[in-house]
Each structure stands twice: as structure tokens, then as C-alpha cells.
Amino acid sequence: MSRRDDGQKSTRRKKPKSRQTGTWSTRKKLLIGLCAAIGVVLIVVFAIIPGLKGDSQSPKTYSAPPPMTIDTSKQYTATIETEKGDLVLEFFASDVPIIVNNFVFLARDGFYDGLTFHRVVREPSPFVVQGGCPIGDGTGNPGYQFDDEITEHTHITGALSMANSGPNTNGCQFFITYAPQHHLDGKHSVFGQLIEGMDVLERLEQGDVIIRVTIDEK
């Protein structure tokens, strides 16, 4: 005899609600959140990658020194922008035309932008700050070398001169003196003078970046 046949109420238990529905809802929310997070990460990564590629590009090189393009009757100045401030340099274009032309060409081509001052010597006595090396360790060059231009200009305080590894090995590296360095006269070609930013020069540290170099022609 069934329980219904004896007049008693059915005692069939109600099935408890499955927890799977709640668990799936939670998992779904977590999955959506995870996908959103991954999407954000991918966006950031793809935004950064182009910049990383730019940083890893090989430095510019050239097969020969640039042709003469400056007008030696005009006055040329360069503004080197750094995070510490600007250095303004006046060139001796009429006296040292080949080297000034070389610097102007490289600067206008963006060669120096992003390079560093890889050598800063102030101790035991003020000496020089040197930059313009495409490798960043003082061994780089633009792919060519050219002869010295030794003139009556000497290494006074703030002199802009070409760094080299011996006679007639000029390329792209340059230095600016913190104090007179006349023992360098006749060995390095002075081609300009710092006219603004000595305080900036004194604050520079090894590794400071040359943001850009702008050439002004008058």
C-alpha cells in the first residue's frame, strides 16, 4: 500500500537547490574579470613594444664624412637639451669649417638625440664632460674618421673640442672643458665655446641623456 493510499500526507523531501548554479555564476564573473585584466595587460604591452624597439635600434652610421653644407660666413650655435637644463654653444665656423660642418650635419640628422654624456670628470680636479658616443662607452664612431683642424683656439674654460683616439681620428664624440686644459692644445681640435649653461655643465652626471641638439643659423 502506498503512503497516499493510507490517507497520510506525502513526506517526500524537497531536493535542495544545487550549489552548481551559484558556483558557475561566481566562476563566470572571475573569468570575465580575468579576460578583462589580460586585455588591459596586452594593450599596455603593445603600447610599450614600439618604444622598446626604438631603443634597441642600431646607432646611425655613415659611409663617409658629410659634404660641406654650412655657410662659413654665417654664425652657428647649438643648443643641447638635457634634463639638467640647456647648454648653448657657439661654433667657430670660419676657422674650423670641416668639424663645425660635421657637428651641424650630425645634429640636424638627429644623430646625437638620445645619446649620453658617458664621461664626466670633476675629480680630483675639474676636467671635461664628454658625449656623442653612439655606443655609450667612448669607443663608438659614426662610421668614418677625418683629419684634425688645429687652430689658434685653445682649451680655455668651456671650450668645445673633438675627442679622438689619436691624430686625425675625429668622428662624432666631443667634450667641453670645466677648466683650462692647455695640455690638450695641438692634440684636439677646438671648434666652439660654451656661451650659456656653465651651471648646467657643472650639474651633469655620467649617463645624463642628450635629449636633442638644435642648430641655429644666423
Which residues does each PLM region occupy?
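Cyclophilin-like peptidyl-prolyl cis-trans isomerases
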Residues: 1-218
